[in-house]
């Protein structure tokens, strides 16, 4: 068998061809090129016989299959005694999908592969921009980025997005980037890097798909965000705080000592959500995230697990529990999604039992309510207990059942004279109210929190009104306080 020689044509200027590339191209009886639309080819001697795969682009409707078809034909040509010389734009191992496929295929078929390097699009792009790659330049493919919903690189470092060769790709890339960058974020389009017609276009992110200059040699340079905002930067700060030269308080923390702070931050986050205060949400989400990353760093320091372990397990769980998104399961509404979710969780529990050598009938196996966190607020815990029990049919047949149970529990409280018994009956009443709320599709925890907020807000208005009138709350009658309360309610409803 012959040899497959892959030659890098460079970015476009014939003068950028390496000596080895020139000799390989000019000495071959024929040269196959991925595309004849490359400026370097015009600088080759007329004696070089060129064959292109442009017909594959024209006859293959699915662009994803183009490189597969080209690589297969190159492998067939390479199997001939004379082999084949295959030339590609730029460097053969930079953003060249066909070469990746050829490398795999050649190894499987026992073919010899020779790669002759070429100048990639990266070097002339950096020259046109006047920037250095060493501060952490990230290089990604525009087709891949456009297919995502969030960028696959972080925003503290610059990124070069290759192959933004059409307005459609630019639009897809723009929408993905806008999940991380502001619409007005400054970026640069680089057209024809490495050619005499190179052009650098500075514009805002939202404008990139409007450029009239986008063509097959267009790339996008994304500048870093002005503030440190990547997850990696946060991990570095927390790791520094926990380091020997870091903060004494952070260094002494353990999973157990941080429990109170995690709970406090969770409740402060809930308060921000109750207020629907966007600025407060942003701050409290950060404080809550701090607790998660700090716990992960404690685990790293103790050799327990890493943040990557946490994220990898979460990613796998999200994909596994959403087969209607990432698999072939159909879920046409939210109810079907919940059914699918519960089926997957049940399968996970069964798999865990098998791993532990247990069966569902094993008295030591995990019960239906065992996974409900014991530290949940009482209302939320009661609701979860009831939902779990309802899944196996332990529930009222209709809403009249829980409504009647509330009345029954009130009567039992009124019939009890013993304080301890009244306490138990009051608990049963609250549990029944939670069950009624569940049937009404009301979140009892949220409903009570909102009632608490309303009470506190209205009572503060009562205090202010009394102070404005020069009255002491302690000296006012209940009727006077009720009047101020009613006025506070009226003002609130009007607002």
Residue ranges with predicted function:
Residues 262-270, 278-300, 304, 308-316, ...:
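An amphipathic alpha-helical micro-motif enriched in hydrophobic residues
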């Amino acid at each position: 068998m012959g040899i497959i020689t892959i030659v890098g044509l460079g970015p476009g200027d014939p003068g950028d061809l390496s000596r080895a590339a020139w000799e390989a191209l000019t000495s071959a009886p024929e040269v196959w090129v991925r595309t004849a639309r490359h400026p370097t080819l015009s600088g080759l001697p007329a004696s070089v016989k060129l064959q292109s795969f442009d017909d594959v682009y024209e006859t293959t409707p699915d662009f994803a299959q183009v490189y597969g078809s080209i690589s297969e034909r190159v492998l067939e040509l390479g199997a001939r005694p004379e082999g084949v010389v295959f030339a590609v734009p730029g460097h053969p191992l930079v953003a060249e999908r066909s070469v990746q496929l050829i490398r795999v295929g050649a190894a499987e078929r026992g073919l010899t592969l020779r790669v002759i390097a070429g100048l990639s699009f990266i070097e002339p792009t950096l020259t046109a921009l006047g920037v250095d790659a060493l501060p952490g330049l990230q290089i990604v493919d525009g087709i891949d980025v456009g297919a995502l919903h969030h960028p696959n690189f972080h925003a503290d470092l610059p990124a070069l997005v290759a192959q933004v060769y059409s307005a459609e790709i630019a639009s897809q890339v723009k929408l993905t980037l806008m999940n991380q960058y502001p619409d007005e974020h400054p970026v640069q389009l680089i057209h024809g890097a490495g050619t005499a017609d190179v052009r650098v276009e500075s514009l805002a992110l939202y404008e990139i798909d409007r450029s009239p200059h986008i063509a097959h040699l267009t790339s996008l340079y994304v500048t870093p965000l002005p503030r440190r905002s990547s997850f990696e930067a946060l991990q570095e700060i927390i790791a520094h705080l926990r380091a020997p030269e870091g903060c004494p308080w952070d260094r002494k923390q353990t999973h157990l000592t941080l429990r109170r702070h995690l709970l406090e931050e969770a409740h402060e986050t809930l308060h921000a959500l109750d207020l629907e205060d966007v600025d407060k949400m942003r701050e409290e989400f950060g404080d809550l995230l701090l607790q998660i990353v700090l716990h992960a760093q404690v685990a790293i320091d103790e050799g327990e697990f890493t943040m990557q372990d946490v994220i990898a397990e979460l990613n796998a769980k999200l994909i596994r529990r959403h087969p209607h998104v990432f698999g072939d399961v159909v879920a046409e509404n939210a109810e079907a999604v919940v059914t699918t979710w519960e089926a997957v969780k049940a399968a996970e529990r069964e798999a865990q039992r098998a791993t532990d050598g247990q069966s569902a009938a094993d008295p030591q196996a995990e019960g239906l309510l065992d996974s409900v966190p014991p530290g949940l607020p009482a209302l939320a815990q009661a609701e979860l207990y009831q939902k779990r029990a309802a899944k196996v049919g332990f529930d009222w047949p209709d809403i009249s059942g829980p409504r009647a149970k509330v009345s029954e529990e009130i009567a039992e409280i009124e019939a009890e004279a013993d304080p301890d018994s009244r306490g138990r009956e009051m608990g049963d009443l609250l549990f029944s109210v939670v069950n009624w709320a569940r049937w009404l599709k009301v979140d009892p925890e949220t409903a009570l929190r909102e009632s608490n907020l309303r009470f506190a807000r209205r009572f503060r208005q009562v205090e202010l009104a009394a102070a404005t009138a020069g009255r002491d709350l302690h000296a006012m009658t209940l009727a006077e306080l009720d009047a101020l309360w009613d006025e506070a309610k009226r003002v609130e409803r009007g607002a």
